From Swiss-Prot:
This is Cyclin-D4-1. Disulfide bonds: none annotated. InterPro entries: Cyclin, Cyclin-like_dom, Cyclin-like_sf, Cyclin_C-dom, Cyclin_N, Cyclins_cyclin-box. Gene3D superfamilies: Cyclin-like. Belongs to the cyclin family. Cyclin D subfamily. The gene is CYCD4-1. It holds the Pfam family Cyclin_N.
Length: 356
């Protein structure tokens, strides 16, 4: 018998015989559900956060080789939601359709906690990737609003375990004022459901997997500037929040973002379909996420005038204005929905300790 790999051993240890509906105890009594889900509001944050900062080193990208990029392109479709996911989200309300509000509520929570702990940009991108893939494959039970929050906790927890070196306890992830506070064992069961539904493909291919490669291609092979790295990260996260680009491959999004940041409208890359990339560029332009600053053609910034809408491109507070000297100024706003002021940009945030 062949020896099990560490991946297979982990799977055999954690996976169990129950079907997905029993992992969270849907078939059990209501008393079991109430035991696992602790209802009630809890405020864990006291006072406003310190001024936001931008850590340029925090958005440094790994440099993939030509062969690595080719392999990523071959496998990236395995790390995307079902093809009909975006259409079902926008349809909403009908049989088999998905509720767009469920996705937005989950992403709002992920962004809040991500900003609170100053996680890496890739962590937010992974969490949204897990969320979208899960929602495209698994129908959440009706009448169980608490599952939206639980799913968001599980997706961010898994993403943090994949990307972060300092991962908070699952209980500590539940910051702010929430209707439900989940026990660690409940979050672990939800994590198992997400893992099994996604077939343990957690090292997901995202636009971050490619963006440095494309930025270097457009920069003559030299490393991109700190400004380009920051702006690319912010754009990718803004795009991830919305639904407009769900039908595009990660490589197409990364190529379009790199071209937008550098200002190369007619850029072309060997691993990306030119027509698809151009279409993605048009979608990003229509979203008005990026355009030249009126005062100077050399200045490019992420628009902060985008209102929140059902298709939720991004929170206005998640926008940074970039200057040619590679510095950035983050906007502050009062987040009334969470009960405290914070900067919701995952790229420009400063960690604060939880008050016990």
């Amino acid at each position: 018998m062949a020896a099990l790999t560490s991946y297979e051993m982990a799977a055999s240890i954690l996976l169990c015989a129950e079907d997905s509906s029993s992992v969270l105890g849907f078939g059990g009594e209501e008393e079991e559900e109430e035991e696992d889900v602790v209802a009630g509001k809890r405020a864990r944050c006291a006072g406003p956060p310190p001024p936001p900062c931008v850590d340029v080193a925090g958005v440094d990208f790994a440099v993939p080789s030509e062969e690595c990029v080719a392999r990523l392109v071959e496998t990236e479709a395995d790390h995307m939601p079902r093809e009909d996911y975006a259409e079902r989200l926008r349809a909403g309300g009908g049989d088999g359709d998905l509720d767009l509000r469920v996705r937005m509520d989950a992403i709002d929570w992920i962004w809040k906690v991500h900003s609170y702990y100053s996680f890496a940009p890739l962590t937010a991108c992974l969490a949204v990737n897990y969320l979208d893939r899960f929602l495209s494959l698994y129908q959440l039970p009706d009448g169980k609003d608490w599952m939206t929050q639980l799913l968001a906790v599980a997706c961010l927890s898994l993403a943090a375990k994949m990307e972060e070196t300092d991962v908070p306890q699952s209980l500590d992830l539940q910051v702010g004022e929430e209707r439900y506070v989940f026990e660690a064992k409940t979050i672990q069961r939800m994590e198992l459901l997400v893992l099994s539904t996604l077939k343990w493909r957690m090292q997901a291919v995202t636009p971050f997997s490619y963006v440095d490669y494309f930025l270097r291609e457009l920069n003559g092979g030299d490393p991109p500037s700190g400004r380009s790295a920051l702006l690319s990260s912010e754009l990718i996260l803004c795009i991830a929040r919305g639904t407009e680009c769900l039908g595009f491959r990660p490589s197409e999004i990364a190529a379009a973002v790199a071209a937008a940041v550098v200002g190369e409208e007619h850029a072309a890359f060997s691993h990306v379909n030119k027509e698809r990339m151009s279409h993605c560029q048009e979608v990003i332009q229509a979203m008005e996420l990026i355009h030249p600053k009126p005062s100077s053609p050399s200045r490019v910034f992420v628009s902060s005038s985008i209102p929140r809408s059902p298709t939720g491109v991004l929170d206005a507070a998640g926008c940074l204005s970039y200057r040619s000297d590679d510095s950035a100024v983050a906007s502050h706003y009062a987040a009334s929905s969470w009960g405290y002021e914070h900067d919701s940009s995952p790229v420009s945030s400063k960690r604060r300790k939880i008050s016990r």
